[in-house]
């Protein structure tokens, strides 16, 4: 499992960095303003059967601050959380650029470890 830089993180539980590396897909409208990033975690480490009901946000944390979304879908089996799908949306060029700075920092933190 890839170690993630502590300065850049994704969290579902405040204070606990998610260690599972997500699959990320970007979608952007032709107008350049609206879009979304869909994150899929296939082996989440911070969401368990005991705490999944309290998970209400995904936090994207970097040196500029915190981005967050409430759009989270969980797939649960009898004995574990199978998959987490979370969608971060934006509706302006500035918000897209801010998201891309986070995404770049997150990707760079993975490649350094």
UniProtKB/Swiss-Prot annotation:
Thylakoid as UniProt keyword: yes
Annotated InterPro entries: Psb28_c1_sf, PSII_Psb28_class-1
GO process annotations (BP): photosynthesis
Pfam families: Psb28
Record membrane topology: Peripheral membrane protein
Keywords, in A-Z order: Membrane, Photosynthesis, Photosystem II, Thylakoid
Recorded superkingdom: Bacteria
Location of this chain's protein in the cell: Cellular thylakoid membrane
Membrane is among the record's keywords: yes
GO cellular component, one term: photosystem II oxygen evolving complex
Family: Belongs to the Psb28 family.
Binding partners and assembly: Part of the photosystem II complex.
Record's protein name: Photosystem II reaction center Psb28 protein
Species this chain originates from: Prochlorococcus marinus (strain NATL1A)
């Amino acid at each position: 499992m890839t170690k993630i830089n502590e300065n850049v993180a994704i969290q579902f539980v405040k204070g606990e960095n998610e260690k599972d590396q997500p699959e990320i897909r970007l979608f952007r409208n032709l107008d350049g303003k609206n879009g979304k990033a869909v994150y899929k975690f296939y082996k989440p480490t911070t969401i368990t059967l005991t705490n999944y009901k309290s998970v209400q946000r995904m936090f994207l944390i970097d040196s500029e601050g915190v981005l967050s979304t409430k759009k989270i879908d969980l797939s649960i089996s009898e004995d574990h959380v199978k998959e987490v799908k979370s969608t971060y949306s934006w509706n302006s060029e500035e918000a897209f650029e801010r998201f891309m700075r986070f995404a770049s920092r997150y990707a760079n933190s993975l490649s350094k470890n």
